[in-house]
Swiss-Prot record:
Physiological role: Catalyzes the condensation of acetyl-CoA with acetoacetyl-CoA to form 3-hydroxy-3-methylglutaryl-CoA (HMG-CoA). Functions in the mevalonate (MVA) pathway leading to isopentenyl diphosphate (IPP), a key precursor for the biosynthesis of isoprenoid compounds that are building blocks of archaeal membrane lipids.
Species per Swiss-Prot/TrEMBL record: Thermococcus gammatolerans (strain DSM 15229 / JCM 11827 / EJ3)
Active site, UniProt feature: 83 (proton donor/acceptor), 115 (acyl-thioester intermediate), 239 (proton donor/acceptor)
This protein's name: Hydroxymethylglutaryl-CoA synthase
GO BP annotation list: farnesyl diphosphate biosynthetic process, mevalonate pathway; isopentenyl diphosphate biosynthetic process, mevalonate pathway
Membrane-spanning intervals of the chain: none
Residues annotated to bind CoA: 204, 244
Subunit note: Interacts with acetoacetyl-CoA thiolase that catalyzes the precedent step in the pathway and with a DUF35 protein. The acetoacetyl-CoA thiolase/HMG-CoA synthase complex channels the intermediate via a fused CoA-binding site, which allows for efficient coupling of the endergonic thiolase reaction with the exergonic HMGCS reaction.
Length: 350
């Protein structure tokens, strides 16, 4: 049985865009409040009072459109992945599709799969375009992640997102997909039940057999199916709940950390959940050269991983400069204290 996922029509990335909120809180400031002195990251991004997963996704979508340079009416699908949607019952994708001018001849849906909801939407977009049902589809991953006050998730749960417009491979695509693979099991490592405000997790169980098992198996299977080795890749982007986990995966797979660091952003913006690998790949595309190959593996609790092999094309040289780069958002920051952070994130519910 062939495990590789590859459509009959070759598919690429026509445009990409990311967005990270301006506000930051240092892990040291959170630790000051809770009496903690060791931290998994340095600081994380915090959404403003007027920001949520929808607005983050919309900004990323607009940046992707700038790079794509296409009429938004040509986009026949807008699929949004998140675990922090502003509405429990109302699609977010319809709002974004309307705001970018893609309605009414468009399909929209909201995807959920913990931190890999965005790449799940991307897999669907690749199939949609690859089957020739449409020429363009947009996949978005964005989150404003929450952690219970005092829980170790509070140190890492950040905010950010990215959008990718998928189209037929051509001279206008900045990169193309060689193939993809999804690996899924029923592993209850992280969850939030209906009406609960904060998620729960299985502590060390979230590492193995959850994160490491799924990412490593997805990466290895993809490479085996494509006949590639780690030496064939110039960059690798893994889901990044912290800094340690993706670097550990790289070490296990035999990938030098120098190939991982350009797309590893969790140390300065936190874990952006559905946006994590999508923002990381956006950062890599901001600096990659034509011909570079990127290994891209997401992870979502519950649990599963999507793995992609992406090859950069000539169009990247011009298109990367048509919208703000990830570095621009990472360096644009304003620090807040825990009191403002708690207010902005509605940490205390009366």
């Amino acid at each position: 049985m062939r495990k590789l996922l590859k459509p009959k029509r070759e598919v690429g990335i026509v445009g990409y865009g990311a967005y990270v909120p301006m506000y930051r809180i240092k892990a040291e400031e959170i630790g000051r409040v809770w009496g903690v002195s060791s931290f998994p990251i340095e600081e994380k991004a915090v959404p403003g009072l007027d920001e949520d997963a929808l607005t983050i996704g919309l900004e990323a979508a607009r940046n992707a459109l700038k790079r794509a340079g296409i009429d938004p009416k040509l986009i026949r699908a807008v699929w949004f992945g998140s675990e922090s949607k502003p509405y429990a019952v109302k699609p977010t994708g319809t709002v974004i599709a309307e705001a970018i001018g893609a309605t009414p001849d468009v399909s929209t849906a909201d995807f959920e799969f913990a931190c890999k909801a965005g790449t799940e939407a991307l897999q669907t977009a690749i199939g949609f375009v690859g089957s020739e049902m449409a020429d363009y589809a947009m996949a978005i991953g964005a989150d404003t992640a929450q952690g219970r006050p005092g829980d170790h998730l509070e140190f890492t749960a950040g905010a950010g997102g990215a959008a990718f417009i998928v189209g037929p491979k051509s001279s206008e695509t900045v990169a193309y997909f060689e193939g993809s693979y999804s690996y899924v099991t029923d592993t209850p490592d992280f969850w939030r039940r209906q009406h609960e405000h904060y998620p729960r997790h299985g502590n060390r169980f979230t590492g193995e057999p959850a994160y490491f098992h799924h990412i490593i198996n997805a990466a290895k299977t993809l490479m085996e199916e494509l006949g590639l080795t780690v030496n064939d890749f110039d960059y690798a982007v893994f889901h990044q709940p912290n800094v340690k986990f993706p670097l550990t995966v790289a070490k296990i797979l035999g990938i030098p950390k120098e190939k991982v660091l350009p797309g590893l952003l969790s140390g300065t913006i936190g874990n952006t959940y559905s946006g994590a690998t999508m923002v990381g790949v956006s950062a890599v595309l901001d600096i990659a050269k034509p011909g570079d190959r990127i290994l891209w593996v997401s992870f979502g609790s519950g649990a599963g991983s999507d793995a992609f092999s992406v090859v950069v094309q000539d169009a990247i040289e011009e298109k990367r400069n048509l919208a703000p780069k990830v570095k621009d958002y990472v360096e644009r920051k304003k620090y807040i204290d825990y009191a403002l952070y708690a207010k902005a994130r509605r940490k205390y519910i009366l």
